[in-house]
């Protein structure tokens, strides 16, 4: 089996064309990968065009299946009504018997390819694609009327702003990166958090990444956004990510209990 590609405009190629040989036990998957990469490479582009960045139907379906498999089944999705760049929906994964909390997960952020320098990408084995999650207490108000109140909506705003930040700033995000509010103000008056750190999804917040390998060849990472205080940010800057996570998640603790307790309103001093 082989793939034949006819290129009519050879001027579109640079002089340093390389030849690569690929072997695979899964010919169908290899073909899908090659077709995806050729389509991306040969697609005409206009720097003045502003187009909506979307998953292919197949990629989106596979991402949704990964979310269901890794984080839980869901029926409700907070759909974005208008999108100027990335179309970002948020899956609402309800509490279950074995997990008394909500999981919010973006659907759409991974359609955007983050701008990571090749040397950094290869040295640290980074993916250029990511989705973002947050965990909320099971009593968080998520009905339409309640989400009109910023006190309930701010986690969604944080998810969406974080997901769009690499596009807005032509940069990239990965585990250990921190983000702050523009004026240093808390995300909500009810909480002391005005910064966030990206960590791995619980329960392996410091040691194991969660990823979704698509048949198109993309690898989508799932980053957990953990709100932190200004003091915790300063501690992290002085001592490093590992030290901060050891402080927030003491040895032997239940990581999810810690995450949820930090967002319980009655537990805020």
Predicted regions and their residues:
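Short linear motifs embedded in intrinsically disordered, proline/glycine-rich low-complexity segments
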Residues: 1-269
């Amino acid at each position: 089996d082989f793939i034949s590609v006819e290129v009519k405009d050879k001027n579109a190629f640079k002089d340093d064309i390389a030849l690569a040989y690929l072997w695979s036990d899964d010919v169908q998957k290899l073909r899908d990968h090659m077709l995806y990469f050729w389509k991306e490479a040969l697609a005409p582009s206009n720097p003045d065009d502003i187009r909506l960045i979307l998953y292919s139907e197949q990629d989106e379906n596979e991402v949704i299946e990964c979310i269901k498999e890794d984080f839980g089944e869901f029926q409700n999705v907070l759909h974005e009504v208008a999108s100027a760049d990335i179309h970002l929906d948020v899956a609402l994964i309800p509490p279950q018997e074995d997990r008394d909390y909500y999981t919010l997960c973006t659907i759409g952020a991974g359609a955007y390819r983050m701008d990571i320098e090749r040397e950094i990408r290869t040295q640290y084995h980074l993916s250029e694609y990511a989705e973002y999650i947050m965990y909320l207490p099971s009593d968080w108000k998520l009905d339409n009327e309640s989400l009109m109140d910023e006190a309930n909506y701010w986690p969604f705003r944080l998810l969406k702003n974080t997901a769009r930040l690499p596009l807005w700033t032509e940069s990239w995000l990965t585990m250990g990166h921190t983000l702050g509010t523009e004026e240093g103000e808390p995300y909500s008056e009810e909480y002391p958090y005005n910064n966030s750190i990206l960590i791995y999804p619980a329960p392996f917040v410091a040691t194991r990444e969660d990823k979704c390998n698509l048949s198109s060849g993309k690898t989508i990472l799932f980053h957990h956004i953990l709100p932190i205080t200004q003091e915790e940010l300063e501690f992290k800057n002085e001592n490093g990510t590992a030290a901060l996570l050891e402080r927030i998640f003491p040895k032997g603790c239940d990581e999810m209990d810690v995450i949820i307790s930090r967002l319980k309103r009655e537990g805020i001093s």
